């Protein structure tokens, strides 16, 4: 789950 910083997936 990529948010406005970089939380993936």
UniProtKB/Swiss-Prot annotation:
**Keywords assigned by UniProt?**
Disulfide bond, Secreted, Toxin
The cysteines joined by S-S bonds are: 2-8
Designated name of the protein: Conopeptide-pc
Which compartments does it reside in?
Secreted
Q: What's the domain of life for this entry?
A: Eukaryota
Write out the domain note: The cysteine framework is C-C.
Gene Ontology CC: extracellular region
Tell me one GO molecular function of this protein: toxin activity
Q: Where expressed (tissues)?
A: Expressed by the venom duct.
